[in-house]
Amino acid sequence: QLLQESGDRQMREEAVAYDELYNKEHKAFVVSRMSIEVFKPVEKYSDVDVETWIIPGKGANFPRGYEMYKGGQLVAKAICNWALVDTVTGKLIASKDYDMGTYSMDEAPELSIPRRFRIPKELKFQEVESSKVAMSMIDINMHMNNTVYASKLYDNIDDAEKYFITSINLRYVHEAPLGSEFKVYRSDAVD
């Protein structure tokens, strides 16, 4: 959530507020992939600083980098890939066709986790949650907010309080609109 909020703040301070982009320009950023690496736990109500910047994109990809600091020490970093969609036509907007010149820009942060991987076919998954997308879960696009997906996954880890999650890779394949059903599947850990 802190990463997303930092992106929203950067938009407001350096270009256009997200609600203005959505309501006046009829455009929406939709996340397609998120890779987060965590080095130290960040407890609730911790004072942290989050830096975010735009990474030069290609095609319809608008990547964004993040670094989170607690007490001056790097505790997490991430790369997220976003698409910009025309909400009237539903068409993707190429990065060359949308001016990001007023945004802070830099290269992608280096992550030590793979950004892409294949899930082994032999894994056996079982459904552990099935529910409907509720009002408290949605964003301005009327779809489940991207931060809710990670929370739902975490909620379905047995004895989660015993573990420190060091990374997460999310690939968003479909949007989950208000009222739609979503399911969480889990497999046993493998070496």
Predicted regions and their residues:
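Terminal targeting signals and extreme-terminal segments of soluble enzymes
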Residues: 1-51, 55-191
